[in-house]
Amino acid sequence: MNGAALWGAYYRLNPDKFCADYLHLSLKRFQKFLLVMMFWSTTFVLIACRGLGKTYLSAIYCVVRCILYPGTRVCIASGTRGQAINVLEKIIQELKPKSTELCAEINEKETRINGNNAQIAFKNTSIIKVVTASDSSRGNRCNVLLLDEYRLISKDTIDTVLKKFLTFRRLPLYAELTDEEKKREYDKEKNLTLWLTSPFFKDHWSYTKCVDTYNAMLDDSRRQFVCGFPYELSIHEGLLDPEIVADEMAERGAQFICAHIRNQVFDGDTIQVVLSGSMHCKLPSEVYVNK
């Protein structure tokens, strides 16, 4: 059991290693970086161009979290149930075939994906569940709230319904600890919210969320993180075809800019969106490959 505890602690600190060893995935550098920050943050905001693989990364995070933290409850909400169900489909159709270990973790009897009831259950009692972003979802509880394309969800619904899900706390047994020791351990593990979306206009509330999270990120006592990636990263990593991007840019103009270009310049108390030039951000230089 000591060996299992050591490996569990190691993989919790290095989720990218878990993806390689257990899920047999070869992640790109930016995916490793984002995955680690997902585990570190209590509030994680990602503004990424379409085609960067937000849903795929969300699926990876949910699986790793549920395996390494038994009894985890993940609720996924989006503008439509179909968009939220895409995360579960990524797990079943893309992640599961690559890993016999993941197949062994999933409780097939309790797993179902349909329009009204979509969830993936794990044998360690963890669950990934799709919820509707409306008043009808009141009563759900979770440790992790994933908001996919959060700009499409009403801010009022997020504040009055979805955020209330996070009143549930994961409570491992800790059989060898006293009640006081258990309480201290429970306090160490915080519930968290993941906000993911493609770029949108500055006058939308989703932009204000980015600014607020950035200001909180500057406070070392808080674990909040925000970043934005433009379409150039997708091309650099081979996720987008440059010719297709050029054609779409010529055809759609401003719509393409809104959906794909999000160079966020952090300048004092504001985030300015620019359409050309390089990205200046307060991140370690070793994250990027300079050529």
Give, region by region, the residue ranges found by the protein language model.
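Pre-P-loop entry segment of helicase/translocase ATPase cores
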Residues: 1-43, 282, 288
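Walker A/P-loop
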Residues: 41-61
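Catalytic P-loop NTPase motifs of RecA-like helicase/translocase cores
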Residues: 52, 137, 153-154, 203
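Post-Walker A helix-loop "phosphate-sensing" segment adjacent to the P-loop in P-loop NTPases
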Residues: 65-72
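Conserved Walker A/P-loop ATP-binding site and its immediately adjacent core
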Residues: 72-93
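Inter-Walker segment of RecA-like/P-loop motor cores
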Residues: 90-143
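Walker B catalytic acidic pair
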Residues: 148-149
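Non-catalytic, compositionally simple segments
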Residues: 156-291
